[in-house]
Structure formats: C-alpha cells, structure tokens
Amino acid sequence: MTIKFLSESTINRIAAGEVIERPASVVKELVENAVDASSTKIDIILERAGKNLIIISDDGIGMTDKELEIAVERHTTSKFDESDFLNINTFGFRGEALPSIAAISKMLITSKKRDADKAFQIKLIGGNEKQVTISVHNEGTKIEIRDLFFATPARLKFLRADKTELAATVGVVKKIALAHPKISLSLTHDGKNLLKLKGQNKDAETNLKQRIIDVIGDDFIKNAAYIDFKTPDFSICGYTSSPTYNRASSEDQFLFINNRPVKDKLLQVALRVAYQDYLARDRYPICAIFLQINPQLVDVNVHPAKAEVRFHDPNYVRNLLIEAIKNALTNKSHVTSTTIASDALELFKNPLVNKQSPVSKVINVNSKSADYRPTTHSTLNTVPQNHVCQKLIDTLSHAKIEQEVENHIEHEQQTRKQYKLGAAKAQLHTTYIISQTEDSIVITDQHAAHERLGYEKIKDYLKTEELIKQRLLIPEIVELPNEKKADCLYDHREKLYKLGLTLEKFGEKSIIVTEIPNILGDVNVQKLIQDLADHLSDFGKNIALTELIEHVTETYACHYSIRAGRKLSADEMNALLRQMENTPLSGQCNHGRPTYIELKLKDIERLFGR
C-alpha cells in the first residue's frame, strides 16, 4: 500500500478519538468554549445521557456568519496570540473541539453576535454539508449535538450505561461550576433538572464558598479548613476537609490549575502526603483547591483533553501544596467533624409517641458511686418517650456511673468557661471521658486521644534526636507467624535501631529484642514487635526511611497510649483534656477517627422536647 494523504473527514475522526471519548467530553469542550466566550449563563440539556442529544446554550459574545464558517474548521481559534504560546489563559486553544465533535455527530450551531442585527446558523452532518443560513436567536450561541458517534459506530460499543455516562457528565459540570462561581449553570436530563446554580456576584472568597456549598454541600464547608497561601509566583486557595470528615474514594477531590480542572498525579500525591499523619491509608479527604500559577511556569498542552499538566519545577509546587494544606489543618487542629455529633443525635430521633411512661425521682449523683434505678413514683401520665432513649436508660439502670470529679461548683464553672473541652465529670465503661462545658457535653475516647498525643510527642522527638533506649532486664524472644516477617524486621534492624529498637534474628521465625524506646515505658513487647512486623512486611526491603519512620511512629503511638479499660482519676482525665487543647490536630487520631464528639445542650434539650 502506498503512502497517501488522509481525507479531512478521516483526520477529524482521528482527532475526535483523542479529544472526545464520551458525552461528558463533548459537554466539557462546549461548556469551556462558552466560558471563554464571556458567558454569564450556560444551560445544558441532555437526552439519554447525551447519546441522543446534547444542547449547550450561552449568552456569550456570539459569532458572525464568517466566524461560524471558520470555527468548524480544524486549528482555528480566537483565544490566543501565536507569538505568546506560553501565556495561555483560556480553556480552549488547540482549535480541535468543534470540528472533532462535528465529524462524529450531527451538529447545528446557531449564534448571534452581541449588538448584531442578525443571527446565523450552520449545519454539519459527520463534519460535511456545511451550510450557513440566516436564523433567529438571542445574543449568544446554541450548539445542538445529535446522534453522537453515529459516524464511528465502533466507539458506541465502548459507551457505558446511561447512568454511568450521566454521572461522568455531572462530574464535569460540577468542576466547571466550582471554577466559575460567577456563571449561572443549569443541567437538565430527560426533562428533569439535575443542577441549577445561580451566579455569585460578591467578593471572590464569598462567591467560592457559596458555590462550594451548592456543589459539594454545606456539611463540607462546616467541616473544612480554609486555605489561603501566597508566594510571588503562586497562590493557593480553597477548602480541604478536617481529617475526621473523609471518604472511601478520591471522587470528591477537586483540583484546579489556573481555574482549569486537572487530574494530576503530582497534586494527588501531595494531598496524600499532607494528610499522611491524620488519615488511614484507605480513606481520602474532600477538597476544592485552586492553584493560580504564572502561565509560563506550567504547560497545559500535554494532552488534547488538557486534564494533565507539566510544571516547570514540580517538587516546588508539591512542597508548596503540602505546606498550604498542613497550615490550614493546623489552624483547625482541635476541631472534629460536626457530622459525628449530628449522626449520634440522629440515633435518638425516632418519632416520639405519647404513652404512659414512668418518670424517676431525682437521683443524687454527688456520691462517689451512685446506682441509677428508675422508679414509678410520678403523677405525670403523658411524657413523650423515645424508644432509643428508653433503651439507653434501661442499659444505664444496671450500670454504675463513676463520679470522679468533686470540685467546688465555682471552680467547675470557671473550668468550663476557660477550657474548650471543659471539666471532666465522669468516666464511662473505663473508656470514655465525659466532660462539661458552658453549653455542651464532650465525650472523649481516651485511647484515641492519647494515641494522637503520643504520636505528636514521638514525632517531635524524632525531629531532633534518636529515641533514648531502655535495656530490657530479660531480652524478649518474639516468635512471628512466618520467616518472611522475621526477615523483614531483621533487614530493617539498622533503621529500627535509630528509632530506639535493638533486635537480632533468633532462629528462622523469631526475633530477640534487647532494647526498646524509653518513651514506651512498660509496653507489651510481644504485641509491639508483631504489629511492627505486620506493618512492614507489606512493603519489603524497599520502603523509604521517611515511610518507615511513619509506620514505626504510628505503632509506637498506639502502644504508648492509654488503653480502653483503664480507670482514670479526675486529675488524669483533666490532664488529658488540657493536653488535647494544646496539641495540634488532637481532634482526630492517626487514622482519621474522631477523638471526641461534642453534643450541644440545645440539641440534647430538643431530644426531650424542651
């Protein structure tokens, strides 16, 4: 076969294969064109998730008849100066979208230039039969795409179910909406309105906040830290969730470079690193983060879809993003997720019914230990009764609540006002500390809280020097499940020595431990070594030192911390609460779980119909 030139229609279909993968790709390209056209209102209509019909209408600057003819040709654009290719500020610039879409669909474009007398229309079928005619239309542009991929039926086979394709399109529209809070956007599918977002016209921070509430939700804003970070060439702003407010996937992570939504591995890794001290490895933060960068320091022309970028100095960008996120999280360091308390209260919000219900007499809880037993000496006949509340009362009626705090009332009131986590009042099930503030009660998980305190303490110590070792009076021999785990620990023995642990191989599956970190005190060495082996065996010999330190520090913190089941005195409980108030990120343990929940008095009163 001889070498020959491809036809224009074939070239366009090949280009479409790079740019247009699914209906969501069409919506992305056309809506971004509308944004570049200075639109303030964009409406999107879909049928069968865009497979049958896609209509994009805007109130942008519009096109003349001459511009319409040129716009559907390849490599035509009005969006940048050829002499300044490195300074691109628009979304589109390759001049490929319209001809690529036209090549695989039936396209109708109607447009009217601002302040023009006439509107014009152009019709294309498979990229051919270009006819420009006079039409009637408001200022702006309307593009109709019918029978997507009719000219490339093989591509149709790769499309997913309507529900999946629609979800992809909704995701695309949400990203564009977040990047442009001043633009009103609507999305309708098969006659049903899915999104209706009003343009915001206040200051930039307020606009962004309201658009995030509209797109991601009010709960996210309530549980997010605001990012505001600037250097001469970079600015980073947006919101990122508290560690306790997380997801099982990275689906709700929205990252933007110069308002362009991107899916960049470098930024995703930076996000993971910023949260590595606060989240379990299978949990993901939620965020909407916007990086504004000098256009000459980033290349957006890496791929036709423009979802990937290349930075002039990637490590610098990575470190800046990590620093910006960590600074924001530190400023919100003592806050736990507000939804935790709401979820707890929801358990009690069963429909209330009026029924005969006994009301117990007042119990004096000032004694060192008081039994709570409801009695029936009441003249009240109709009290709203919540089934879940009653279940809790029934459980507590058989338990002793240890009253550990017997300070003077005046001192207690002062403590409640002075400290965020209040004054310790009791310990439940030797696991949870109950404390009281001016307007709430706080329930603290003593193990999770102390684990975070220990983690921060050990981490700070490792920044300055090696951990002090304590020699075991009798060396501990630890037998592991298999030789692989024993070999893994032995392979890392030099690094572990710097982290306060001295060990040697003892047979095929055993390790002998002679020294442990002094900070761990009277620790269960058997359990410590087994947990370390479990952590490290998954990574083998190639684990980086920083990652090894992270794993070891997590394990140490867990074994250093107060265990559930340990009885604490009033002074010990208050000391723990005061330490939490003075420790960064004490609102969650190392795995992203909350260390405490706060129940507001007004919410508790609502449970009792007050």
From Swiss-Prot:
It holds the Pfam family HATPase_c_3. Transmembrane segments: none annotated. SUPFAM superfamilies: ATPase domain of HSP90 chaperone/DNA topoisomerase II/histidine kinase (SSF55874), DNA mismatch repair protein MutL (SSF118116), Ribosomal protein S5 domain 2-like (SSF54211). GO terms for molecular function: ATP binding; ATP hydrolysis activity; ATP-dependent DNA damage sensor activity; mismatched DNA binding. The gene is mutL. CDD domains: HATPase_MutL-MLH-PMS-like, MutL_Trans. Belongs to the DNA mismatch repair MutL/HexB family. The keyword DNA repair applies. This protein is involved in the repair of mismatches in DNA. It is required for dam-dependent methyl-directed DNA mismatch repair. May act as a 'molecular matchmaker', a protein that promotes the formation of a stable complex between two or more DNA-binding proteins in an ATP-dependent manner without itself being part of a final effector complex. GO terms for cellular component: mismatch repair complex. It comes from Rickettsia peacockii (strain Rustic). Keywords: DNA damage, DNA repair. One of its GO terms (biological process) is mismatch repair. It comes from the Bacteria. This is DNA mismatch repair protein MutL.
